[in-house]
Amino acid sequence: MSQSTYSLEQLADFLKVEFQGNGATLLSGVEEIEEAKTAHITFLDNEKYAKHLKSSEAGAIIISRTQFQKYRDLNKNFLITSESPSLVFQKCLELFITPVDSGFPGIHPTAVIHPTAIIEDHVCIEPYAVVCQHAHVGSACHIGSGSVIGAYSTVGQHSYIHPRVVIRERVSIGKRVIIQPGAVIGSCGFGYVTSAFGQHKHLKHLGKVIIEDDVEIGANTTIDRGRFKHSVVREGSKIDNLVQIAHQVEVGQHSMIVAQAGIAGSTKIGNHVIIGGQAGITGHICIADHVIMMAQTGVTKSITSPGIYGGAPARPYQEIHRQVAKVRNLPRLEERIAALEKLVQKLEALSEQH
């Protein structure tokens, strides 16, 4: 489909979903639900935005089957999906908004590639990128402008390294990995020994960083190499911008780490863990599978059971909820205590009179 305008019926067929409404409605763009006009397609995923459904002018709204049962009586054009509405909307995004490339196909003449480096077929290396000795760049990879692939490092097939990424020596990047601008993979860890005279001596870090397949790493995120063992991010994990992962940390499969979180050295994060923004995790501990940490959680010891945690130090969400409720009740509790104190004073005065 290469045209710029589609009917509702055409889109339903392309997306392989059902529709309700006027199949001849023409759609030519995408927009948020509260701002969409008659030519726009939008979606409802988060129920917080359901309040905009009735007033939305969108030409079509992508919703789940469960949502459709709730809102089917509204006089709207609906595209009804069994999967996440956001995933279906993504297909529309890619249909209406054409991605833009850098305009530098192939290997640019200003790229510096060591003669011992191995560059496989169909690789794009943009201006002023550097590929060091014995590095290996897999087929169909994209290396952005000014990026560095360090000595003896490997980049797996179909990986996309954006501009100004630094991948240091002896780093292993898996297949289909995406690394956003400014990320640094494989810096020396923050390891020092303090002498008897109070001087801090840096310890060389000679371990590796291993990034497995289908990992995504956000802008300006840093992942340090181990001192003698490896720092590892397992398959399918997603890391936001400005995240610090220290030496010899292991992040399990399909975990998510949100912006400005920090993980200290030698900590092991389980599979399917979600770490909220600005969370801080101390070193040398373990986090169980299926743990969710709320934003700004401070973790000082291992978490052994799945669940939702928050606060500093980290506690189960139910406990935090009870504590918050008690704090909210403090003003009333203070009034009750003051009233009881007055009553006690009156009783004491009566007792003294008798």
Swiss-Prot record:
Pathway noted in the entry: Bacterial outer membrane biogenesis; LPS lipid A biosynthesis
Any single GO CC term annotated in Swiss-Prot or TrEMBL for this entry: membrane
BP GO annotations: lipid A biosynthetic process
Reaction it catalyzes: a UDP-3-O-[(3R)-3-hydroxyacyl]-alpha-D-glucosamine + a (3R)-hydroxyacyl-[ACP] = a UDP-2-N,3-O-bis[(3R)-3-hydroxyacyl]-alpha-D-glucosamine + holo-[ACP] + H(+)
Presence of keyword Acyltransferase: yes
Domain of life: Bacteria
EC number: 2.3.1.191
Gene Ontology MF: a single term: N-acyltransferase activity
Keywords carried by this UniProt record: Acyltransferase, Lipid A biosynthesis, Lipid biosynthesis, Lipid metabolism, Repeat, Transferase
CDD domains: LbH_LpxD (cd03352)
Active site: H247 (proton acceptor)
Gene3D superfamilies from the UniProt entry: 1.20.5.170, Hexapeptide repeat proteins, MurE/MurF, N-terminal domain
InterPro entries in alphabetical order: Hexapep, LpxD, Trimer_LpxA-like_sf, UDP_GlcNAc_AcTrfase_non-rep
Family stated for the protein in its record: Belongs to the transferase hexapeptide repeat family. LpxD subfamily.
Biological role stated in the UniProt entry: Catalyzes the N-acylation of UDP-3-O-acylglucosamine using 3-hydroxyacyl-ACP as the acyl donor. Is involved in the biosynthesis of lipid A, a phosphorylated glycolipid that anchors the lipopolysaccharide to the outer membrane of the cell.
Subunit text: Homotrimer.
Protein name listed in UniProt: UDP-3-O-acylglucosamine N-acyltransferase
Species annotation: Chlamydia trachomatis serovar L2 (strain ATCC VR-902B / DSM 19102 / 434/Bu)
Species classification: Bacteria, Pseudomonadati, Chlamydiota, Chlamydiia, Chlamydiales
